[in-house]
From Swiss-Prot:
Heme b b562 binds at residues 83, 182. Keywords: Electron transport, Heme, Iron, Membrane, Metal-binding, Mitochondrion, Mitochondrion inner membrane, Respiratory chain, Transmembrane, Transmembrane helix, Transport, Ubiquinone. It comes from Cephalophus spadix (Abbott's duiker). The gene is MT-CYB. This is Cytochrome b. Its cofactor is heme b.
Amino acid sequence: MTNIQKTHPLMKIVNNAFIDLPTPSNISSWWNFGSLLGICLILQILTGLFLAMHYTADTTTAFSSVTHICRDVNYGWIIRYMHANGASMFFICLFMHVGRGLYYGSYAYTETWNIGVILLFATMATAFMGYVLPWGQMSFWGATVITNLLSAIPYIGTNLVEWIWGGFSVDKATLTRFFAFHFIFPFIIAALAMVHLLFLHETGSNNPTGISSDADKIPFHPYYTIKDILGALLLILALMILVLFSPDLLGDPDNYTPANPLNTPPHIKPEWYFLFAYAILRSIPNKLGGVLALVLSILILVLMPLLHTSKQRSMMFRPISQCLFWILVADLLTLTWIGGQPVEHPYIIIGQLASIMYFLLILVLMPMASTIENNLLKW
């Protein structure tokens, strides 16, 4: 009797990706974040779909419709807070996933890595547009400030901003198009995630040692399916603790005030997951320079395969690089803290030093450390 799992065109794809996939036997919990990101994406699409059923993308009713969801729709409050805090969990998983890739040299799979960077940009764009939809004070002013950054582009900047706004300020046209894009983007992300997996399965997974694991592979199911289920349960536990005990912990109180173009909030700041990039943007006194630094702070990931000078792929056996990696993590945490602080002494200088340190670590210190470690191997 033929096994449908291995003959049916659709089942064959599922089988080769999630069941009979040969997987390294030594991948740690840092390899769980890929599946967790998939779960986050599905959760966001489902909660988002139900929110879209009750939301109205109009400047006069957007804020009221979100209030209506929380007060009048059955379980609307939990759907709304799962969606808002689900985005935070999504970014926590994203940062862990990227960090894992940097530490263990997963960027050596250049196609997979580059698709991953595109996925990161797409997710950030989606989250930004989603933040505008409740049409609170921080939604409106966040949209105004961030879209305005494009006016720093020489010659076409101003026209570009007005084209995105659909007018001369952030208004109804902007909200409507942001809702349309926010709805479609997660499906584009899902398609890109499939391409990401397609490229990954061309080479197979990396592992903590960074050396070939062809000699020691195990089937994905049941070993890693059960491991992924454990990860998923912990993710959902963390999300539900956040949603049910302190749903507004990561939000901004200003967003509970309806958008008012005549009143600027004292401190305009994005959601916590953008603060590191926002701090880099603010540390440069020039507008165009700041925008370039902002884009480069994430685009720099594309250069990782080129900046890899070590003879070893993973950082597992490279103590100097390990030390620099954790300094980079601390630096990003510092930038995140600075991004949420007002623009005044001493925060300005701390932010500038942390921004310089960020680029210095990635572009200079880490490649140098790798070269030193290569030479130490000869002794």
